Amino acid sequence: MNSNFKHQSIQKHFGVIIENDKAITNITDSTENISKGSIFFARQGMSSHGSDYIKLALNRGAILIISSKAINNKKVHYVPDLENILAGFLYDYYDIEQKKVKFFGITGTNGKTSIAYLAHKITQDHKK
């Protein structure tokens, strides 16, 4: 996928313009995956909010930070309904047709990993 499409997708969903000469290397909501050219989504986690790691993200080379929490920082783009927009953005960004994606939920105390493995194997065999 060309970089121009990625830039347009970000502008379409978040209203942010990234100069075309800035290469987007990855998108992440995990500080462990931030590198030069990353877009970091600062979201609510289990014990903290991604906005707590803005300085770290910038130090690691993030070119854009999109946060679900209002932050007084010019480098952070606030999107109050980030969770509602994010899924549509990811489908668009990775050029995935939503109708082709299937989700399965596996719950219970025991056997989840085995069932997930078997379900994956069956769906892969069915594609052939």
Task: Set out the residue ranges of the language-model regions.
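N-terminal leader/targeting and accessory segments in enzymes
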Residues: 1-88, 92
